Amino acid sequence: MTPHASPDSTTWFEDNRKNWDDRAAVHQASGYGIPELIDDPEAIPSTLAPDVDRLGDLRGAAVIHLQCHLGTDTVGLSRLGASRVVGVDLSGASIAHAREIAESCAADIEYVEANVYDARSAVEGSFALVYTSLGVLCWLPDIDAWARVVASLLSPGGRFFIRDDHPMFMTVGEDVSNGLRIEQPYFQRDTPLTWEDEDSYVTTPGAPK
């Protein structure tokens, strides 16, 4: 299933894939909570911890994590007792790191390199839980098409869980010295927003940017 967007959307996805390929090594080098996951077989990532009580009992459930990046939260989902855990991400470099992390954590996780819009054709089976969180919505050119993918992955009675920033958060300009100002669009548009940044959202002294 492809998103309903401009013909240039393929180029946008490729730019985003390259961006996340570049970020993958930086994020792994930053720590990203990975050493704690490896050292403690019961550790749950701090990014997943707020969701644990809301997710309920996952023992024996099939779970898919969309836009999983390095898969640290995917490891956490496997530690909550899911019988099958799948992580999907656009970035091949992120998936490669995710597989290494899962192996170091002795976590049985299937990782699939695929555009989230192609997740239904890339992954077999259905899932009791489709999970995604933190910084996922802002990368999607077509929310309706994405929602249809999510629905297609759910087994009867399955649940979809998302935790992300409110869209209003992305409308506020970066310079807040004179208060909050709305500078970016709230609603979906046909063209992407672009930024040129020298670093990522983690601090990694000495790491490549």
Where on the chain are the PLM-derived regions?
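Conserved alpha-helix/loop element of class I SAM-dependent methyltransferases that forms part
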Residues: 32-62, 76
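A short His-aromatic
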Residues: 122, 138-139
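A short glycine-rich, Lys/Arg-flanked "PGG" loop and its adjoining helix->strand segment in the class I
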Residues: 144-159
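Conserved class I S-adenosyl-L-methionine
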Residues: 159-198
